Regions:
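A short, solvent-exposed, low-complexity linear motif enriched for acidic/polar residues
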Residues: 49-407
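Bacterial N-terminal signal peptides
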Residues: 1-6
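Ser/Thr-rich, Pro/Gly/Ala-heavy low-complexity intrinsically disordered linkers and tails
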Residues: 7-54
Length: 407
């Protein structure tokens, strides 16, 4: 599947939808959302310099509850079992033999909107009908923690957290059960005005770093090499077997008029766009984040192989056999050329495979920008763009993605 991300020139990182002090997270009236109602505190009273958050009350039959999920992969990570794991397995494996786990996976959601008529313009799905309701954050969410609601996969390992609830249109009354409403959301730079949905004390420390650096997404985790012993004298032998990493991306974007995999496909669309409520129950609308997109080796193509070697080869302790655990930062990755990867010591980094369903090319490891150009061939820029494509709806629904930053 080919993905298309649109860049909107002139769109900055400033959030134009910040709530005024004391404002609700919704748009008023029966479309009120987010902190409205009689829900429970979402972060156990821990704000850590952010704004407090109250879990939205159940919107009831005919209402919409908005949740956020990083699926089970943001919570459990990516295991690697030598001789068993596959690039196209479930879950997919890093082809170079690394097990990757996240301690924190932070995303700041700016707003969630509902519009009339998701099918208004089939040639341009970004063109929707009138605004019906809006929940305005920002909401700071840790996808590696999740919440008490089982996600769209049905797996108990997919733990999602609610950020907003719509009981009906902002103008009053109830949603119509015989029509679909276009659903969209935005991501924005981390800010002290964000409501702390579920960040713990350690996550709040990382979030402060995200605020300082203008990051929308911030990840911390650890990778452990689980593949076969590397060849003696190779650059792979000089990599630490354990790498702690911090990744952050200043990549605000709009995810517009999303497809809904809960609905039956019709016509030329893979899935219909929008949400449709039920008179007999609430409807779950799940913002879904796919963490694998960050580690793809080709932009704008679904499901390309995952690699960690470029990050490991940039680690602080790279350079000797049996190197101790190392650390990799975004500054390390910004300095790398993704068209010809090198190690921290400047040696060419070859391709390799530790799985049976990926055959590595000859020569130096190089990623494919697939027509996307950057001011320089920085791996940091590549990662930022690729991470942006991870936003979906209801598991695998595609959205019209508009980049509110310069690639």
């Amino acid at each position: 599947m080919v993905l298309v991300l649109a860049w909107t020139p002139g769109c900055g990182e400033e959030d134009e939808n910040k709530p005024e002090p004391g404002a609700s997270a919704g748009s008023g009236g029966s479309g009120q959302a987010g902190n409205g109602g009689s829900g429970q505190a979402g972060s156990g009273g821990l704000s850590g310099g952010l704004q407090p958050f109250t879990t939205p009350a159940d919107p009831g039959n005919g209402g919409i509850l908005v949740t956020v999920s990083g699926e089970d992969l943001a919570i459990n990570g990516y295991p690697f079992i030598s001789g068993t794991s596959k690039s196209e397995g479930d879950p997919p494996a890093f082809v170079d033999g690394w097990e990757v786990k996240f301690n924190h996976f932070l995303v700041t959601i700016g707003s969630v909107t509902l519009h009339d008529n998701p099918d208004k313009n089939p040639d341009d799905p970004k063109d929707m009908g009138a605004l019906v309701a809006e929940a305005t954050g920002p909401f700071a969410v840790d996808l590696s923690i999740g919440g008490p609601i089982v996600g769209k996969s049905g797996s108990p390992d997919e733990k999602t957290v609610a950020i907003a609830a719509f009981t009906g249109p902002a103008s009053g009354g109830k949603f119509q059960t015989d029509q679909r409403y276009a659903i969209s959301y935005t991501t924005v730079a981390a800010t002290a005005q964000a409501r702390n949905v579920n960040l713990d004390a350690e996550g709040l420390v990382l979030y402060q770093q995200a605020i300082a650096k203008g990051w929308v997404m911030a990840l911390q985790g650890k990778a452990t090499y689980k593949g076969k012993p590397p060849k003696a004298g190779s650059v792979f032998e000089k990599m630490p077997r354990e790498v702690t990493f911090t990744l952050g991306f200043a990549n605000p974007a709009s995810y517009l008029n999303c497809q809904n995999t809960d609905l039956t496909p019709v016509g030329d669309e893979e899935f219909p766009r929008g949400v449709q409520v039920s008179a007999g129950d609430k409807t779950i609308a799940q913002i879904t984040w796919h963490s694998d997109h960050i580690f793809w080796n080709k932009l704008n193509v679904e499901g390309t192989p995952l690699h960690f070697d470029p990050i490991a080869a940039a680690a602080s302790t790279y350079g000797s056999k049996d190197a101790p655990p190392g650390v990799t930062t975004m500054e390390d990755l910004d300095a790398l050329d993704f068209l010809a990867f090198k190690t921290r010591d400047g040696e060419p980094l070859p391709w390799r495979s530790e799985v049976e369903d990926f055959t590595p090319p000859e020569g130096t490891l190089a990623f494919d920008g697939n027509g996307v150009t950057f001011p320089k061939n920085s791996f940091g820029h590549f990662l930022r763009y690729s991470a942006t494509s991870g936003g979906h709806f209801n598991a695998n629904g595609e959205c019209e993605v508009v980049l509110n930053f310069t690639p």
